[in-house]
């Protein structure tokens, strides 16, 4: 049974009873079922900086961080809470992430063009050959019953420029899964969080990496099999947020990995111990044997 408890707090404006209204639902293990923020009437008079923008005061932003962080870091499958946590802590890391994008020609072009990956994007990718980035992205989405627009929109970041930086990271996250053949399961989501922290220094990824494994049944096995690979790959590879993925849809995914200086996890016994990962790799091998994979020199 889930009990919804509305809690009203008035901070910094005692005349406004609606200043802050977080809606928190508790289950038996205190899992947040919904967490929404309604701005104070004073903030509603401000000009919205982009469609869907919800301006928050510092106090509201702090409460959003705490409320979403308590459960979000423990349950990385709660995309809504992870999204809220990442936005409420954006001031810590987004400027640095934006600077990383500005350091490469490809990253600067992304910020100039501001491309977005939508459901319409993937329709034309279905015709590409197996083994291309675009087609494997479509196959990965289909295998998990996901779609590009299932990601939460950016709402709480004031700067339109930084809001797009966050949107870009959010929309390309599933491409990282595709690049490394990682299925959308908790152990592999956590592995990717470790990699993202190593690659982009994301605080949310760090928190998820530290607390998320508490929910794993095979913590020690996961730590041994995935953490060293994720840390090394993230550290040694190119910053993934600077990749203009849309210009690489037709590129062989193995060729792309070599260009970015990254590799999949080929440590001894990893495939045998992780069935979801093994299944993706086996499908690729079978397509290669049939000659239905793009011709590229890569160990498989």
UniProtKB/Swiss-Prot annotation:
This protein may be expected to contain an N-terminal transit peptide but none has been predicted. This is Ubiquinone biosynthesis protein COQ4, mitochondrial. It catalyses: a 4-hydroxy-3-methoxy-5-(all-trans-polyprenyl)benzoate + H(+) = a 2-methoxy-6-(all-trans-polyprenyl)phenol + CO2. Lyase that catalyzes the C1-decarboxylation of 4-hydroxy-3-methoxy-5-(all-trans-polyprenyl)benzoic acid into 2-methoxy-6-(all-trans-polyprenyl)phenol during ubiquinone biosynthesis. Keywords: Lyase, Membrane, Metal-binding, Mitochondrion, Mitochondrion inner membrane, Ubiquinone biosynthesis, Zinc. Its main location: mitochondrion. Component of a multi-subunit COQ enzyme complex, composed of at least COQ3, COQ4, COQ5, COQ6, COQ7 and COQ9. Zn(2+) binds at residues 173-174, 177, 189. GO terms for biological process: ubiquinone biosynthetic process. PANTHER family: UBIQUINONE BIOSYNTHESIS PROTEIN, UBIQUINONE BIOSYNTHESIS PROTEIN COQ4 HOMOLOG, MITOCHONDRIAL. Pathway: Cofactor biosynthesis; ubiquinone biosynthesis. Belongs to the COQ4 family. It is an enzyme of class 4 (lyase). Its cofactor is Zn(2+). It is found in: Mitochondrion inner membrane. It is a peripheral membrane protein. The gene is COQ4. Its EC number is 4.1.1.130. GO terms for cellular component: extrinsic component of mitochondrial inner membrane. It comes from the Eukaryota.
């Amino acid at each position: 049974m889930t009990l919804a408890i509305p809690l009203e707090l008035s901070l910094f404006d005692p005349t406004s009873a609606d200043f802050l209204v977080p809606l928190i639902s508790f289950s038996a293990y205190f899992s947040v079922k919904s967490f929404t923020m309604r701005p104070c009437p004073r903030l509603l008079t401000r000009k919205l900086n982009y469609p869907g923008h919800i301006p928050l005061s510092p106090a509201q932003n702090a409460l959003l961080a705490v409320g979403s962080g308590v459960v979000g870091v423990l349950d990385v499958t709660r995309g809504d809470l992870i999204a809220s946590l990442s936005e409420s802590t954006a001031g810590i890391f987004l400027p640095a992430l934006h600077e990383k994008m500005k350091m490469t020609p490809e990253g600067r072009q992304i910020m100039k063009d501001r491309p977005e990956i939508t459901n319409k994007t993937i329709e034309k990718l279905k015709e590409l050959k197996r083994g291309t980035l675009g087609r494997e992205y479509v196959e990965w989405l289909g295998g998990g019953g996901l779609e590009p627009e299932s990601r939460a929109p950016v709402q709480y970041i004031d700067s339109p420029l930084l809001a797009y930086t966050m949107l870009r990271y959010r929309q390309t996250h599933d491409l990282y899964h595709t690049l490394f053949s990682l299925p959308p399961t908790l152990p592999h989501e956590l592995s990717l969080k470790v990699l993202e922290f190593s690659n982009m220094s994301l605080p949310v990824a760090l928190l998820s990496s530290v607390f998320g494994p508490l929910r794993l049944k095979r913590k020690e096995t996961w730590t041994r099999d995935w953490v060293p690979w994720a840390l090394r790959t993230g550290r040694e590879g190119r910053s993934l947020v600077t990749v203009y993925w849309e210009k690489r849809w037709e590129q062989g995914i193995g060729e792309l990995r070599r260009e970015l200086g990254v590799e999949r996890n080929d440590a001894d016994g990893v495939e045998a111990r992780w069935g979801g990962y093994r299944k993706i790799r086996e499908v690729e091998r079978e397509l290669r044997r049939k000659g239905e994979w793009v011709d590229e020199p890569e160990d498989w």
